[in-house]
A protein has these predicted regions:
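ATPase catalytic-site recognition across NTP-hydrolyzing enzymes
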Residues: 1-24
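Acidic, Mg2+-coordinating catalytic module of metal-dependent nucleases/exonucleases
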Residues: 172-193
Length: 201
């Protein structure tokens, strides 16, 4: 597990905290990522649900309630997640009530009962947390590792590039949905840069 970000899956200990990150999408993919935190604060992306047609950056066009059903189904059918307390953090936009019932309200009131709290959408701080997490320490261990079953994370994250008009940020016209939901979870578990001893190559 050293000097790598992608690792084989393993059974998550029962006492590890589980997070669920969510970026809503309709014509673009929605993204859900489940993360486990170990005793050292290291995060593992252990599972994902990506609402994509198979064509990059093309969403399934399914409504918020159907997305909630699929999220709940994924948790009920996974031994690592079934029966666990899971903290949900999502794009703050799903709490918008300006046009009626919010997406968060729709997903909470149905039998699938998904409860979210709004993630920190500060883009620069979130990008820095991603850098801190992916950096290797002196022993070759990053603070974010990804199970090799998370194919869409592995496909999309390395392809992200900076915004030409704002080089401090990622270009949001890309397939950045996994990046966004990951940021929300990372911002709930912030690292200090002084904990990082060696940058990634």
């Amino acid at each position: 597990q050293r000097w790598t970000h992608v690792i084989k899956s393993f059974r998550i200990p029962a006492h590890w905290k589980i997070w669920r990150g969510y970026d809503f999408g309709y014509s673009r993919p929605f993204s859900v990522g489940w993360y486990a935190a170990d005793e050292d604060g290291r995060l593992y992306r252990i599972k994902e649900l990506y609402g994509c047609t198979g064509t990059p950056n093309e969403g399934l066009k399914i409504d918020p309630v159907e997305q909630a059903r699929r999220i709940r189904e994924a948790e009920e059918n996974d031994p690592m997640l079934k029966g666990r307390v899971i903290q949900g953090v999502a794009d703050p936009a799903i709490f918008n009530e300006s046009q009626g019932e919010s997406i968060a309200q729709m997903q909470e009131k149905h039998t699938y009962y998904l409860v979210w709290h709004p993630g920190d959408h500060t883009r620069l701080a979130g990008k820095m947390q991603m850098h801190y997490r992916l950096a290797f320490d002196a022993e070759g261990r990053p603070m974010l590792q990804v199970f090799d079953t998370c194919k869409h994370f592995i496909r999309t994250i390395p392809n992200l590039v900076y915004d030409e008009s704002n080089v401090e940020d990622i270009d949001s016209d890309q397939e950045d949905h996994i990046y966004d939901e990951c940021r929300y979870v990372l911002m709930e578990n912030p690292l200090s840069p002084r904990q990082i001893q060696k940058e990634t190559a």
